[in-house]
């Protein structure tokens, strides 16, 4: 597998592996295939699609995805066990992720082994995979809580064994962006190996930590659609891509206009509805109600928006409610094909706010029209 040389960052989507490891989430086989196709269509570089050593439907679906002829690299996840890697190779994938714990708490309490055993197991699995000619990512599980000297030694051993990159796993979402930058830069300075960020959201910093890793020299970022994943989830595909584009000025050539569509599909397939305020793709992200905000957004959308909503498959919404001002009312009636004067807007506004308070929500279009009929139309009739 050869990645294009001209891209500043490569996106590795693990919705179908780590995303499906969200407690209670199971994708149907056809859903996994459709998600893989959708992600490939928008230009994702690599898809981590499952764990073949589970056997059964899992292995069968990984093999089906590998045979689709997608443009993206297809990766399967493995423990640092030769048998696992063999199972993946039988599926026809072009890349394997070989994962093993590196922190002392994992080595001593979960694996009940030694650091040397970790190095030996990883090396054996990597060498086997490279002999078979596939791309290899070595996953340092719980890297964020690993002794720095050992983490560098682990990275060096992975490189010597032939690994193509190191996946830096903040497995329990323990880091902040400052520490992330420090650790990733230390690895990059010590070992000539590509690094992938794999960050979890336990403290709400998954996306920020992923960006910090990129700042420190990581060229790969692992993500999931909607931030699905173990516990609090992973860095979200849509957040990372848009942040890289607008914060770091890195356009990855991904068709972001389908983000909302893909997010909705994954939300439905996973049984995890999208929160209205979900960053980038939530329905409220481009919804404006406050009078000052609406006035600014109507004059120039970029006063209160960083990018055009159509860029991620959304539309701007002007919501009429308690905090609305006259500019919002005038604009809303323009959408209805009616001209509302400034005087009429000032007359209607108190009634709008009162109804919104009574209903404890914004007004629907019909309700706004009823108010208009009662306050403006009938008011004029009475005046005559």
Swiss-Prot record:
Mn(2+) binds at residues 18, 198, 200, 234. It comes from the Bacteria. Residues 9-260 form the Pyruvate carboxyltransferase domain. Its cofactor is Mn(2+). InterPro entries: AIPM/Hcit_synth_CS, Aldolase_TIM, LeuA/HCS_post-cat, NifV/FrbC, PYR_CT. It catalyses: 3-methyl-2-oxobutanoate + acetyl-CoA + H2O = (2S)-2-isopropylmalate + CoA + H(+). The keyword Magnesium does not apply. Transmembrane segments: none annotated. The keyword Repressor does not apply. GO terms for biological process: L-leucine biosynthetic process. It is found in: Cytoplasm. GO terms for cellular component: cytoplasm. GO terms for molecular function: 2-isopropylmalate synthase activity; metal ion binding. Its EC number is 2.3.3.13. Keywords: Amino-acid biosynthesis, Branched-chain amino acid biosynthesis, Cytoplasm, Leucine biosynthesis, Manganese, Metal-binding, Transferase. Pathway: Amino-acid biosynthesis; L-leucine biosynthesis; L-leucine from 3-methyl-2-oxobutanoate: step 1/4. Catalyzes the condensation of the acetyl group of acetyl-CoA with 3-methyl-2-oxobutanoate (2-ketoisovalerate) to form 3-carboxy-3-hydroxy-4-methylpentanoate (2-isopropylmalate). Homodimer. Belongs to the alpha-IPM synthase/homocitrate synthase family. LeuA type 1 subfamily. This is 2-isopropylmalate synthase 2. It comes from Caldanaerobacter subterraneus subsp. tengcongensis (strain DSM 15242 / JCM 11007 / NBRC 100824 / MB4). The lineage of its organism: Bacteria, Bacillati, Bacillota, Clostridia, Thermoanaerobacterales. The gene is leuA2.
């Amino acid at each position: 597998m050869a990645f294009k040389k001209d891209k500043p960052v490569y996106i590795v989507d693990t919705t179908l592996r780590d995303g499906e490891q969200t407690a209670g989430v199971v994708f149907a086989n056809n859903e996994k295939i459709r998600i893989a196709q959708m992600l490939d269509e928008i230009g994702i570089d690599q898809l981590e699609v499952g764990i073949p050593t589970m056997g059964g439907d899992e292995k069968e679906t990984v093999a089906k995805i590998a045979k689709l002829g997608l443009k993206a690299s297809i990766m399967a996840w493995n423990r640092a066990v030769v048998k696992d890697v063999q199972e993946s190779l039988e599926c026809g994938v072009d890349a394997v992720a070989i994962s093993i714990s590196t922190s002392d708490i994992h080595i001593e309490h979960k694996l009940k082994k030694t650091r040397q055993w970790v190095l030996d197991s990883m090396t054996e699995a990597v060498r086997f995979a490279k002999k078979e000619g596939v791309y290899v990512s070595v996953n340092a599980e719980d890297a964020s809580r690993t002794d720095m000297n050992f983490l560098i030694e682990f990275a060096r051993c992975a490189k010597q064994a032939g690994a193509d990159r190191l996946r830096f796993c903040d497995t329990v979402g323990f880091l902040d962006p400052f520490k992330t930058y420090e650790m990733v830069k230390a690895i990059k300075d010590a070992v000539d190996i590509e690094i992938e960020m794999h960050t979890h959201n336990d403290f709400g910093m998954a996306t920020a930590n992923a960006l910090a890793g990129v700042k420190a020299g990581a060229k790969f970022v692992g993500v999931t659609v909607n931030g699905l994943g173990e516990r609090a989830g992973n860095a979200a595909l849509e957040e990372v891509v848009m942040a890289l584009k607008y914060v770091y000025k890195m356009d990855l050539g991904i068709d972001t206009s389908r983000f909302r569509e893909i997010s909705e599909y994954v939300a439905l397939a996973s049984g995890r509805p999208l929160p209205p305020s979900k960053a980038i793709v939530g329905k409220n992200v481009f919804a404006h109600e406050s009078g000052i905000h609406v006035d600014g957004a109507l004059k120039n959308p970029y006063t209160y928006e960083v990018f055009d909503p159509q860029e991620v498959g959304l539309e701007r919404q002007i919501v009429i409610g308690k905090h609305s001002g006259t500019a919002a009312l005038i604009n809303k009636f323009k959408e209805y094909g009616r001209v509302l004067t400034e005087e009429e807007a000032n007359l209607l506004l108190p009634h709008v706010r009162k109804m919104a308070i009574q209903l404890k929500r914004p007004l629907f279009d019909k309700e706004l029209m009823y108010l208009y009929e009662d306050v403006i139309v009938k008011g004029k009739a009475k005046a005559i």
